[in-house]
Amino acid sequence: MEVVPAEVNSLLPDDIMDTAITLVDEDSIEAVIVSSPIPMETELEEIVSINSTGDSTATPISTEPITVYSNHTNQVAVNTTVSKADSNTTVKPAFPSGLQKLGAQTPVTISANQIILNKVSQTSDLKLGNQTLKPDGQKLILTTLGKSGSPIVLALPHSQLPQAQKVTAQAQPGDAKLPPQQIKVVTIGGRPEVKPAIGVSALTPGSQLINTTTQPSVLQTQQLKTVQIAKKPRTPTSGPVITKLIFAKPINSKAVTGQTTQASPPVVTGRVLSQSAPGTPSKTITISESGVIGSTLNSTTQTPNKIAISPLKSPNKTVKSAVQTITVGGMSTSQFKTIIPLAAAPNVQPIQVPGSKFHYVRLVTATTAGSSAPPVSQSPSVNTQPLQQAKPVVVNTTPVRMSVPFVQAQAVKQVVPKPINSTSQIVTTSQPQQRLIMPATPLPQIQPNLTNLPPGTVLAPAPGTGNVGYAVLPAQYVTQLQQSSYVSIAGNSNFTGTSGIQTQARVSFNGIIPSESASRPRKPCNCTKSLCLKLYCDCFANGEFCNNCNCTNCYNNLEHENERQKAIKACLDRNPEAFKPKIGKGKEGESDRRHSKGCNCKRSGCLKNYCECYEAKIMCSSICKCIGCKNFEESPERKTLMHLADAAEVRVQQQTAAKTKLSSQISDLLTRPTPALNSGGGKLPFTFVTKEVAEATCNCLLAQAEQADKKGKSKAAAERMILEEFGRCLMSVINSAGKAKSDPCAMHC
């Protein structure tokens, strides 16, 4: 090791010389050891100059806060501040008083990559902006683990040298010998290594190179003070202390890499920093004049499998092709990774693979000139492997068709409904037989027109759907069907009539006579969810198709005859007498109908529609088992309800007729030409609004809109102009109608 010259040692303040040098074995060295790597980022926002030969004037140095942070809970806050000093101001770095001394006095062995931390003495005031910092303490050296070969640079303020010593140092740089000094060292790793120390003094900015002393000095064994890093650094009451500072600015995209901070002396842009020591290779850092302030810090730690990201925007910046990271504590395994944000984000293209836990990126060569380090992004939780040449990844480019096979077959098969009396047939694409696929929705135009068929034609059902067939009868046969009179028991009016709603013959099954159901109007059903295929649907229970009903999604019609027959069969399987009339006809000659079995009402008073007697509009008889019956001849409640029921049926018929008439009128309006309604011998004004008049009016409105657009009118003004034009068009139509009414000859000519 080289001895620090006595002149440098004499320049140190007296307040740090409070401990004597004690030589102890190296086994008793106590240090704060950080087992896990501490990723840190550094940046040199402004570059200062250092020269070994120069005049005695002080160099103006800008204020520079430096904070080293860690990703762990115990954060080390290091604030090194160099104030802009005048010629009579002492320049000293500052360090917050958040560290405590621990352990006994032990000798120190200085490792590589050290950060020299000084505190401002009590007499000197450090000005930062409008605030003054007056911390006190002693000088510390923060060291990290690294391999041998890196010298230690001790930067001392040039203003502390007396004038006589400055001249002596400049005249005889190699003969000066300084007594050993006491410097407290903080080691983050605990592995001591012998490193040469190089004394450097501050120089004027006019110097071009940073030269070390020709006679290497040896830093003697000094006293080691171990410190404990607090979780929360204390803030001095004398002024604010920056506890965390990220050196790498994302705006300027500084190329600062590694997990450990490497401190370097202040360097002037455009200058070359050279270090020479016996047995150590020389390293050169060249910083060119560019818009990005900062430089790439290189280390000698051999971690060839880690590549740091250094996107460079300045085309004239020279960087080593392989920039390596720094590992704390000698741990160079790949399980600790660092993610450094890239300024040139488009150079890394992420690849998303469905169902994969790993993240993949595609490396793209940077387009900027002068950048030689490829960008690499690493995941913090995944052990990455060396990336090879990127290959295109194709993930499911073709659509996948998924089918649920009913049987194990190779071909995609379409299963058709299976007939009852035949074996199952599977239609495949290999068969030459063709099948007609009918739509599921009912289409009236596909149904055959029964009125155009000749009399006597038999409509055979589809095979396997049942034995029910239809026969086309002449119109005179339908009119000759027996029609029974409608008997009203509401009063003595003897109202008789027939229904005009039922227009086609009903199909008789299970003993139901079509003339009986067609002889009187039935209340329309209001089914919504039963598809009109349940017994509580009156139309379905009486064997009738729904006609002019208020039901929705009805299947009780010819379009869904297959579903209807299946529902009838299911009902008959449960109850063979389900469709037999509960209210049957009497003997021949009797006008009144009677029960086949009586009702069993308990709370409705037999005045609800679910009472079989009341629904059939007959009175309860002796065979009924009802309780509290009000369905008898002289019951006032029954008379009132029957009148209301009759009125409701009449109202339903009127509404149905009105709907039919309205639909016919609408169809006539759509098919016939322009209506000519006479009003006092002339046409009404709206009859003049023909298709040609409407087109001419629209053209006028569009012309007004274009005119407003050309004049640059506002939206409200344009709307006003269009509405005024529309009013003028309507007035012209009305005037034309008035002239035609006053002159009938012109209308007919």
From Swiss-Prot:
Name this polypeptide is given: Protein lin-54 homolog
Q: Which GO terms describe its molecular function?
A: metal ion binding; minor groove of adenine-thymine-rich DNA binding; transcription regulatory region nucleic acid binding
**Marked site: Critical for interaction with target DNA:** 536, 610
Q: Where is this cross-link: Glycyl lysine isopeptide (Lys-Gly) (interchain with G-Cter in SUMO2)?
A: 139, 357, 639, 659, 661
* Sites where the protein binds Zn(2+) 4: 599, 601, 606, 611
Which residue stretches belong to region DNA-binding?
523-536, 599-612
Positions binding Zn(2+) 1 in this chain are 525, 527, 532, 537
Subcellular localization, per the record?
Nucleus
What keywords sit in the KW lines? Acetylation, Activator, Cell cycle, DNA-binding, Isopeptide bond, Metal-binding, Nucleus, Phosphoprotein, Repressor, Transcription, Transcription regulation, Ubl conjugation, Zinc
Species per Swiss-Prot/TrEMBL record: Rattus norvegicus (Rat)
Q: Where does Zn(2+) 2 bind?
A: 525, 539, 546, 549
In this chain, Zn(2+) 6 is annotated as bound at 606, 620, 626, 629
Interaction with DNA (site feature) positions? 574
Could you confirm whether the keyword tRNA-binding appears in this record? no
* Sequence positions that bind Zn(2+) 3: 532, 546, 551, 554
